[in-house]
Amino acid sequence: MTTLAIDIGGTKLAAALIGADGQIRDRRELPTPASQTPEALREALAALVSPLQAHAQQVAIASTGIIRDGSLLALNPHNLGGLLHFPLVKTLEQLTDLPTIAINDAQAAAWAEYQGLEGDITDMVFITVSTGVGGGVVSGGKLLTGPGGLAGHIGHTLADPHGPVCGCGRTGCVEAIASGRGIAAAAQGELAGADAKAIFKRVGQGDEQAQQLIHRSARVLARLIADIKATTDCQCVVVGGSVGLAEGYLALVETYLAQEPAAFHVDLLAAHYRHDAGLLGAALLAQGEKL
């Protein structure tokens, strides 16, 4: 069975056909509409899937935000603008006339990365550190989504009660400090206004402030991982995302994790599927799992 997989992100929409063998073909991308209106998103999705839908038997969506009953929600509803409660599943079923499932993109990526692990692993956690910080939890060989779709939103756990206000509305979340957006927001002086990519580049040039910002992010992530180990007793943690996979970052996280008591240590692995993880994970879930 061929699945039409769709990945809905803050800046881009992606779609591809994925066979039962997990091979990705005919991958396409469009920019996410700047206008946060249901009409604009529906039109963009229609343009994205129309060349592909005739070759698929089902649709699987991986999307930013919380997916509940097939609709799009967010920790902070204001972040979605007019897309709050957008009916993802219903819309794609109408556009394609195919059975459709939808899941959070980090949860989908977690499932893809879990399927790619070697050895007898039943419990793992995936963390993506990019513009934000998200995640997914696999326990006993099953992906946890939760009755309300919130499971795995680990970027919104507490890192610093006196830290910056997060986009979700809480104060001091991991995401507000460790994410690419959090790194950039803390930059001052010469680095003010620089994004995380530029700050990483300055690390390689020996910039002291840039090094401090990246170390701060890695230290917060290591503490999060120790908390995750204590909560889930997972066998490994897979780290992805543009920040998580940046040169030298995972090694820094490992250094800070090693400073935690031994009971909270866990194997850290770099994500394998990178930007295709959401597409692949959603397709794998549609092909073999009931959400």
UniProtKB/Swiss-Prot annotation:
Q: What class of enzyme is it?
A: transferase
Reaction equation(s) it catalyzes:
an N-acyl-D-mannosamine + ATP = an N-acyl-D-mannosamine 6-phosphate + ADP + H(+)
> What are the protein's UniProt keywords?
ATP-binding, Carbohydrate metabolism, Kinase, Metal-binding, Nucleotide-binding, Transferase, Zinc
Gene3D superfamilies for the chain: 3.30.420.40
Q: Which InterPro entries match?
A: ATPase_NBD, ManNAc_kinase_bac, ROK, ROK_cs
Annotated GO MF terms: ATP binding; N-acylmannosamine kinase activity; zinc ion binding
Q: What Pfam families would the database entry show?
A: ROK
* Annotated binding of ATP, by residue: 5-12, 132-139
Q: Return one Gene Ontology term, BP aspect.
A: N-acetylneuraminate catabolic process
- State the signal peptide span: none
Entry EC no(s): 2.7.1.60
* Keyword Zinc in record: yes
Quaternary context = Homodimer.
Q: Which HAMAP family match?
A: ManNAc_kinase
**Protein's UniProt name:** N-acetylmannosamine kinase
Q: Which organism is it from?
A: Escherichia fergusonii (strain ATCC 35469 / DSM 13698 / CCUG 18766 / IAM 14443 / JCM 21226 / LMG 7866 / NBRC 102419 / NCTC 12128 / CDC 0568-73)
The gene behind this protein is: nanK
